[in-house]
Amino acid sequence: MFSSSIRLIVSGFHRTQPLKSPVNSPSVFISVPKFFNSESKSTGTGSRSVAMSSVEKTGSDSGAIENRASRMREKLQKELEPVELVIEDVSYQHAGHAGMKGRTDDETHFNVKIVSKGFEGMNLVKRHRLVYHLLREELDTGLHALSIVSKTPSESPSKD
């Protein structure tokens, strides 16, 4: 059933720590199976469901800069190929909070729900570390808070 797998080096996930070279830091190796054709990107049809709470792109030309939610979706979709992926921008709930004063970016807080066979055999900590690893660039460039729900298809209620 699994066509290929990837090996990820997962280390140093606290967002204020700099990324360390795998040679110089302890690492955990996680094998994540790929089990869907990466070319198919259906949204909300069949067994795969992708939900977004914000606009895919800003601007109208094909070279427009994607927003943070869209970049997060692409990274998670590419590596985990989830059967369900919900990304919700809840930054508006934190506007005016002390930590947000003076910030120019407005996409800082997200809720993410991922249902993927790639999580099978992983405990909750390893699942979250994997998601943080995949979103490292976003965490380093303004993503302030991330709430993660990570499940396997057998742990998630059926949508029949």
From Swiss-Prot:
Where does the record place the region Disordered? 39-66
UniProt entry keywords in alphabetical sequence: 2Fe-2S, Chloroplast, Iron, Iron-sulfur, Metal-binding, Plastid, Transit peptide
User: Could you tell me which InterPro entries the record lists for this protein?
Assistant: BolA (IPR002634), BolA-like_sf (IPR036065)
Q: Where in the cell is it found?
A: Plastid, Chloroplast
What GO MF terms are annotated? 2 iron, 2 sulfur cluster binding; metal ion binding
* Interval spanned by the transit peptide: 1-50
* Positions with biased composition (Polar residues): 39-61
* GO cellular component terms, semicolon-separated: chloroplast
Q: Which residues cross the membrane?
A: none
Q: Fill in the misc note.
A: The GRXS14-BOLA1 apo-heterodimer model derived from NMR data shows a domain arrangement totally different from the holo-heterodimer showing evidence for a Rieske-type ligation of a [2Fe-2S] cluster.
PANTHER family per the UniProt record, alphabetical: PROTEIN BOLA1, CHLOROPLASTIC, PTHR46230
Described by its record, this protein's role is as follows: May act either alone or in interaction with glutaredoxin as a redox-regulated transcriptional regulator, or as a factor regulating Fe-S cluster biogenesis. The glutaredoxin-BOLA1 heterodimers bind a labile, oxygen sensitive iron-sulfur cluster.
How does this polypeptide assemble, per the annotation?
A: Interacts in vitro with GRXS14, GRXS15, GRXS16 and GRXS17, but not with GRXC5. Interacts in vivo only with GRXS14 and GRXS16.
Q: Which family does it belong to?
A: Belongs to the bolA/yrbA family.
Indicate what this protein is called per its UniProt record.
Answer: Protein BOLA1, chloroplastic
